[in-house]
């Protein structure tokens, strides 16, 4: 009986119920997948990859053939909780080039994204495995991940999608 509901008081919020009990909505995966599928629809030049076992040590991204990214200028992962977090540093290691950072700086300011430090994620693993291009992770509108009170802000999800789209057009 798993169902997704729109909050009556805040129509921007989606949450899940199962047998009259709040449950996690799986927003960390669903928001990123939705954003990627949307990007494929409007920007046919983008490449999308979905990795398996990200939450079990990023096994899928660790095993990928790096030549898949040979024609890519950068990697954008939409798998960060909240809104407006721009992850380009993991444990003191930057995963973004100075040139790419300068190139998208005005777009980042326009959308009010702020640098934050990230934790283990696929783009961090790819950077560590010397994929050779800038790798960032962006907030995409889910909150309280992996809990029964997880929810999605539709407004924040669309904000991250528009930010990503503008980065791609830059």
Language model feature labels by segment:
Residues 1-15:
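Acidic/His- and Gly-rich active-site-bordering loop/insert found
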